């Protein structure tokens, strides 16, 4: 095989890899807790794993809480582990209306100036001063994935969600690159319902960098 044939073959393989389906993760409402807040809500009860998640080292815990806002409450909101340095609550726009909380659209971890909420566990209550957000839709990927897809950490891209009979394109999808991440797009339940993505065959494909 000469150089030109090799380059043609490599280009074809890379193009096929760029068109491969991106696994879709639908994020239901959930919480992340720091160690101090966890110990207050679940004293003498070590965090326990219920289900492993796709991202390495992350899991859904057995522990759940009730969120209480000015207008309503949401029960059985699952804790995701492991514990973090700062507590955070991720909900959908629909959830925010149910609670009566003006949760801003933010990237995970960006909680400055965000509203709080009351957390109730089977053992205690805690008034979280801040940390309630609607999570910005995003794609997790490794540096190799980013190289293949021609994107960088912090980029905004357009992604097509291929669900049932509907196909919906989401703009402003944030790219998050880390050696510890696996390729997966995260959307919330409102976005999943709009795209008809509530079936196991649903997947995402990159449309174009923005």
Curated annotation (Swiss-Prot):
CoA binds at residues 26-28, 71, 78, 193. The keyword Signal does not apply. Zn(2+) 1 binds at residues 30, 32, 90. Phosphate binds at residue 84. Zn(2+) 2 binds at residues 138, 140, 186. One of its GO terms (cellular component) is bacterial microcompartment. It is found in: Bacterial microcompartment. Transmembrane segments: none annotated. Keywords: Acyltransferase, Bacterial microcompartment, Metal-binding, Transferase, Zinc. Involved in 1,2-propanediol (1,2-PD) utilization within the bacterial microcompartment (BMC) dedicated to 1,2-PD degradation by catalyzing the conversion of propanoyl-CoA to propanoyl-phosphate. Required for optimal growth on 1,2-PD. CoA is regenerated within the BMC (for use by PduP) via this enzyme, although there must also be cofactor transport across the BMC. Directly targeted to the BMC. Expression of a cosmid containing the full 21-gene pdu operon in E.coli allows E.coli to grow on 1,2-propanediol (1,2-PD) with the appearance of bacterial microcompartments (BMC) in its cytoplasm. Formed by 2 beta-barrels, each is capped on both ends by short alpha-helices. This is Phosphate propanoyltransferase.
